[in-house]
């Protein structure tokens, strides 16, 4: 009998020491307490899907009875790390965890949203929207108010691009095409259009035309107008390059050998695209108790 009691005590203590499980992420709202009815889950899910479609921010809700020996912060971090909410590059996931029997709640925010959904804002949402409703045993109402508050914050001040590198790619493409045009223009303008005059005059004429085309493109198609200083530098540099090319070609054509041990070569390096973590959280957010 004594051994049976010892074994029973050991088993009970072992079971009690097991941490709360992290369920598999299969839907936006996971309720392990069965506190929400099907209609409430459907409405909350619809709101979360709408937020994702409008902002690309992934928000998930998890309701558990208790976090046992873990704090709500520890458990929420473990769930976030397991679920990896948010885009891998933007790290813009949000997790709402409610431990209903413990009467604790946590809003865990991904790295990429910590400046948008600050700790202070998350705490205010919990205190002003969730806890008053939870005290009245209105779980669905508190979650709805919190989701609405998060949605207002996300949509009023920030809009996520579907492809974060889209604008960078377009800008890089524009620079690439103009670089090709500039190289060909510097090489062929003096021979196609300006045959007469000294090398300096031909360089000036070519520089004026090339710079004028570039300036016209800025005024017609660009959202930004470069300053006069930038344009002047481009104009001067173009004239210098054309003049140098003409002098080199003239010396070669006249039979004099021209060798340059330190000939310049223009090169560019494409910087690698920025890559984020992978839907992770650094512990940003806030917790509350009622």
UniProtKB/Swiss-Prot annotation:
Major subcellular site: membrane
Biased composition (Gly residues): 265-290
Region Disordered, residue ranges: 264-290
GO-annotated cellular components: plasma membrane
InterPro entries: TPM_dom
TM regions (residue ranges): 175-195, 206-226, 228-248
Record bears the keyword Zinc: no
Signal peptide location: 1-16
Similarity-based family: Belongs to the UPF0603 family.
Protein name per UniProt: UPF0603 protein YgcG
Lineage: Bacteria, Pseudomonadati, Pseudomonadota, Gammaproteobacteria, Enterobacterales
Gene of this entry: ygcG
